[in-house]
């Protein structure tokens, strides 16, 4: 079971519009904040267990975010905390663990996602190195109950260390509180064999990070402790669209039935 949650939570994604400093920013930050709040409220209304914000619209991404990105996300996170009662998570693309923890600390968020906590990933941003040491040092300086959810073989990347070694290093040496297993790209389904292996080898919760939908949730249910859902709950199942409240409610209703089994 994931700390702070009941049985097998659904974590809904709020994919933020392009933020100040990013290539596609449209020069209206207030609208971005309002949109994020509305998306988070949809997730709460639908019955999701948590919300996670991510600077999804900022492509092309930097390895670590600019200060204006961190400041913008802090404002958005604070606004959501004031309007929505669900646990809140922070993910800063491409791999800004320090920025994410810093925001979570000051706004009293509940968890962060780190794309590369341990090891090395070869990505469209170049070579990304793990941030476990830097994050552990910051956590020592600023103690909190913030949990670290870390990807193993994060999507949109190539990996030259085998999955099993990466998994064990992320937990044993990177000190992840939970691991995230995803498909190869946003919205792509996860390899169930990897979920099975993760459940076998580590004692921390295993979360599905991509590709969960109404049709496969029942199958995935037995192999995971939680689900991060973004693409499927959007209008027409497209990640760049806004959340479709009916799709969101539909998958929550199914999850609630599965929780009773």
UniProtKB/Swiss-Prot annotation:
Coiled coil: none
Pfam annotation, one family: BtpA
Protein family: Belongs to the BtpA family.
Name of protein: Uncharacterized protein MJ1115
Domain of life: Archaea
């Amino acid at each position: 079971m994931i700390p702070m949650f009941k049985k097998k939570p659904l974590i809904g994604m709020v994919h933020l519009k392009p933020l100040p400093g990013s290539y596609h920013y449209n020069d209206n930050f207030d609208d971005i904040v309002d949109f994020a709040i509305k998306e988070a409220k949809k997730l709460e209304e639908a019955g999701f267990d948590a919300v996670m914000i991510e600077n999804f619209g900022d492509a092309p991404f930097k390895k670590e975010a600019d200060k204006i990105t961190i400041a913008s996300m802090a404002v958005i996170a604070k606004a959501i905390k004031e309007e929505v009662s669900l646990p809140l998570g922070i993910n800063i693309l491409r791999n800004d663990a320090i920025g994410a923890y810093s925001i979570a600390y000051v706004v009293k968020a509940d968890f962060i996602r780190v794309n590369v906590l341990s090891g090395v990933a070869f990505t469209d941003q170049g070579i990304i190195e793990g941030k476990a040491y830097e994050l552990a040092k910051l956590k020592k300086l600023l103690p909190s109950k913030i949990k670290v959810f870390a990807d193993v073989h994060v999507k949109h990347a190539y990996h030259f260390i085998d999955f099993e070694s990466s998994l064990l290093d992320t937990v044993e040496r990177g000190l992840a509180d939970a691991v995230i297993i995803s498909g190869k790209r946003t919205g792509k389904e996860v390899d169930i064999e990897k979920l099975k292996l993760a459940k076998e080898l580590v004692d921390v919760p295993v979360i599905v990070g991509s590709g969960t939908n109404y049709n496969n949730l029942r199958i995935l249910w037995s192999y995971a402790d939680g689900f991060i859902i973004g693409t499927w709950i959007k209008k027409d199942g497209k990640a760049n669209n806004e959340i479709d409240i009916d799709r969101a409610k539909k998958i929550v209703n199914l999850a609630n039935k599965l929780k009773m089994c």
